[in-house]
């Protein structure tokens, strides 16, 4: 699915998105574009299942890395489904990450998270990370990879 220019925001050295005490921060984000999917690409009220944000960088109109982000309350399973759908609609790069940032990640979801993490890697070629409340990542330009700050 094509993303209109009006929905793209050029990032500075630090890019963030936040919602109801949940946040995602990307450091060294100078070459990234931030897209608000839920509420912009798909207006509020649209029933399409989708994640909240997509970050990507590109070189010569080709995406190098994509980061899908869902900021969710408690329903981790729904967050994962939203990420899956968004990857199917928007993925263009072979290097992808997906983050579900929930209010509280219960230990009852450990088995589901492990299963989905493995499934994402095999079927979607995407690294899935599920975290509580806040995530900070660093982008490494030399390897086009992310590391999660602890």
Predicted regions and their residues:
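Histidine-anchored nucleotide/phosphate-binding helix
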Residues: 81-91
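Nucleic-acid nuclease catalytic cores
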Residues: 76, 90-116
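Conserved catalytic cores of phosphodiester-cleaving nucleases, focusing on short active-site segments
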Residues: 53-55, 65-73
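A cross-taxonomic marker for long C-terminal extensions/tails that follow the last structured domain
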Residues: 1-12, 16, 130-150
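Active-site-adjacent loop/helix micro-motif of nuclease/hydrolase catalytic cores
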Residues: 45-46, 64, 75-83, 109-113
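Outer-membrane beta-barrel translocator/channel fold
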Residues: 106-124, 133-148
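A short, structured beta-strand/loop element
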Residues: 48-58
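Acidic-basic catalytic patches of nuclease active cores, encompassing PD-(D/E)XK
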Residues: 1-45
């Amino acid at each position: 699915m094509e993303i209109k220019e009006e929905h793209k925001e050029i990032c500075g050295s630090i890019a963030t998105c936040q919602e109801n005490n949940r946040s995602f921060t990307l450091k060294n984000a100078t070459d990234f574009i931030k897209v608000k999917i839920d509420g912009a690409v798909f207006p509020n009220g649209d029933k399409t299942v989708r994640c909240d944000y997509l970050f990507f960088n590109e070189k010569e109109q080709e995406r190098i890395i994509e980061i899908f982000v869902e900021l969710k309350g408690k329903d981790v399973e729904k967050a994962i489904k939203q990420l899956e759908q968004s990857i199917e609609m928007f993925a263009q790069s072979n290097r992808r990450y997906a983050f579900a940032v929930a209010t509280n990640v219960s230990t009852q979801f450990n088995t589901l998270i492990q299963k989905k993490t493995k499934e994402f890697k095999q079927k979607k070629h995407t690294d899935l990370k599920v975290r509580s409340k806040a995530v900070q990542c660093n982008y490494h330009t030399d390897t086009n990879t992310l590391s999660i700050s602890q």
